[in-house]
Curated annotation (Swiss-Prot):
Zn(2+) 2 binds at C508, C511, H529, C533. The keyword Nucleus applies. It holds the Pfam family TAFH. Residues 1-95, 204-242, 387-417, 561-586 are annotated as: Disordered. It comes from Xenopus laevis. This is Protein CBFA2T2. It is found in: Nucleus. PROSITE patterns: TAFH (PS51119), ZF_MYND_1 (PS01360), ZF_MYND_2 (PS50865). Residues 56-68 have a biased composition (Polar residues). GO terms for molecular function: transcription corepressor activity; zinc ion binding. Residues 228-237 have a biased composition (Basic and acidic residues). The lineage of its organism: Eukaryota, Metazoa, Chordata, Craniata, Vertebrata.
Length: 586
């Protein structure tokens, strides 16, 4: 067959080919030369007809990379990052089978529906932003890269690496279908999409995929998810690839010997070992197509198994290739993470159980305390009732018959209470009444004690105030008496100084009575002495002669004239007391 090597020609069975780069059922084909090669042509239902595309069809800078195993998408490698609508022009001329287009469109619609539902789960505003981004992506107003960046900014969740190649491979199909429907309705694609938005984002026909298969486990700032979302995402392994894993597409020198062993598919049929890929190199495969993500491989293996059962081939190999089965065993790191989460959950449960046990113990103790307190107040109430009854009927205390009757009444009352007809509400009511009565008595006693204490305090304050006033009056009286006594002592003492008590050497010139040791003590004592100075003079005095001394003696009575009194008072107001001059009676 032309264009396909002999060992890898198709058999006569009808097989629907996959479009290049789609994540549906794809087989690995070896190429005879490493240069650019067009994708496989569609199969003619009437028979196989070799069709080859000339190399000029790839002059737009698009090189189709080889398809990967496990149904993973293989996006084209672009030399320029243009919008996604540029791929629709190259695919518009290719006629694809109806089943291929329907399957790819269904996957793409389910993917877009999942994105919108994920945004709605976060918040209605984010859901509206995601819906706007999806419509803009389908209308080719934004590129796939811009859609990826804006979606990550809106939801704070990055998409998985296989999403961008998947969109680049399958978005042109959806855009071509939208263009065809818009032309049939004589509308523009944007108008048709605005009117038939429910067809694109319809969730009733097929269940959308899990958002954890499309989004990373950690958000942009590295925070953990909420617990409810974490439970949904924990059913799969972390996003980090295992350390030791056979690459899905590897060059010939790195072909693992483990692939030479026959593998068993889900229908227990053995398949021959596929030959190594001799014409591929790591430079031909973009980094986003390696798909080392464990979650992606599990989802791809599930799709491969479903397609294998639906195809009904049951081990019939058309091209001698088989799809590699994915190892579902967890790595040591994944097991450690799972055990750590399990241990944390068990610790949380144990803490909750311990807290519940402590709370129950506290409640039990509180109930016991309340029961004891209730019994105590019941006893107090019964005692108060007995005392009240005893005070109301004092005559019964003197007669034994009345005492016996009272005891029998109390016993009868207690028996009626403990009988089957005793109501619990009545017990609580009486207990509350007893408690209230005791509280009222206690409050009255407290108020009485407070009033008595206040009265005593007022009496003590009044008595202390009276005692203090009496003490002040007594102190003033004693001070006055002491002053008079000092003055009297000074008057009686003629040889001692009236100020300091030492031996006196001078006499006051005003009264000729006060004695001082010097002028300093006379000045110091003048404030007290000037009130009585001159008042103790004798009423009769002998007339003074000119030859007589200016200072009269204390034994000679002198009768001072008014002029002498004025001069003595003027002399007493001066700084230094002076001698009194004799004035004639003339």
């Amino acid at each position: 067959m032309v264009g396909i090597p002999g060992p890898y020609q198709f058999t006569g069975d009808k097989r629907v080919p996959a479009m290049p780069g789609s994540p549906m059922e794809v087989k690995i084909h070896s190429r005879s030369s490493p240069p650019i090669m067009a994708p496989l042509p569609p199969v003619n239902p009437g028979g196989l007809r070799p069709v080859g595309f000339p190399p000029s069809s790839h002059s737009n800078g698009i090189n189709h990379s080889p398809p990967t195993l496990n149904g993973a998408p293989s996006p084209p490698q672009r030399s320029s990052n243009g919008p996604s609508s540029s791929s629709s022009s190259s695919l518009a001329n290719q006629q694809l089978p109806a089943t291929c287009g329907v399957r790819q469109l269904s996957k793409l619609k389910r993917f877009l529906t999942t994105l919108q539902q994920f945004g709605n789960d976060i918040s209605p505003e984010i859901g509206e932003k995601v819906r706007t981004l999806v419509l803009a992506l389908v209308n080719s107003t934004v590129t796939i890269e811009e859609f990826h960046c804006k979606l990550q900014e809106a939801t704070n969740f990055p998409l998985r690496p296989f999403v961008i190649p998947f969109l680049k491979a399958n978005l042109p199909l959806l855009q071509r279908e939208l263009l065809h429907c818009a032309r049939a309705g004589k509308q523009t694609p944007s108008q048709y999409l605005a009117q038939h938005e429910h067809i694109l984002l319809n969730t009733s026909t097929s269940s959308p995929a899990d958002s954890s298969e499309l989004l990373m486990e950690m958000n942009g700032n590295g925070k953990r998810h909420s617990p409810d979302r974490r439970e949904e995402e924990r059913e799969t392994a972390p996003a980090e690839p295992p350390v030791k894993r056979v690459c899905t597409i590897s060059p010939a020198p790195r072909h693992s010997p483990a692939l030479s062993l026959p593998l068993v598919n889900s229908t227990s049929h053995f398949h021959p070992t596929p030959p190594p890929l001799q014409h591929y190199s790591l430079e031909d495969i973009p980094s986003s197509q390696l798909y080392r993500d464990h979650l992606n491989k599990i989802g791809e293996h599930r799709d491969v198994r479903d397609r294998h059962h639906s195809s009904g081939v049951n081990g019939n190999l058309n091209n001698g290739y088989q799809e590699e089965l994915v190892d579902h065993r967890l790595t040591e790191r994944e097991w450690a993470e799972e055990w750590k989460h399990l241990d944390h959950a068990l610790n949380c449960i144990m803490e909750m159980v311990e807290k519940t046990r402590r709370s129950m113990a506290v409640l039990r103790r509180c109930q016991e305390v309340d029961r004891d307190e209730l019994n105590y107040w019941k006893r107090r109430f019964n005692e108060s009732n007995e005392i009240r009854k005893g005070s109301e009927h004092p005559s019964r205390q003197h007669s034994p018959s009345s005492t016996d009757s009272g005891a029998s009444d109390s016993v009868r009352d207690f028996g009626s209470r403990t009988g089957a007809g005793y109501v619990t509400d009545e017990i609580w009511r009486k207990a509350e009444e007893a408690v209230n009565e005791v509280k009222r008595q206690a409050m009255s006693e407290v108020q009485k004690a407070v009033s008595e204490a206040e009265q005593k305090a007022f009496e003590m304050i009044a008595s202390e105030r009276a005692r203090m006033e009496q003490t002040i009056v007594d102190a003033k009286r004693r001070a006055a008496e002491d002053a008079v006594l000092v003055v009297n002592e000074q008057e009686e003492s003629t040889e001692s100084c009236w100020n300091c008590g030492r031996k006196a050497s001078e006499t006051c010139s005003g009264c000729n009575i006060a004695r001082y040791c010097g002028s300093f003590c006379q000045h110091k004592d003048w404030e007290k002495h000037h009130r009585i100075c001159g008042q103790s003079m004798h009423t009769q005095a002998k007339p003074l002669t000119p030859s007589r001394s200016l200072i009269p003696k204390a034994s000679d009575p002198v009768l001072l004239s008014p002029t002498l009194e004025r001069s003595s008072s003027a002399t007493s107001r001066s700084s230094t007391p002076a001698s009194v001059t004799a004035v004639d009676g003339l």
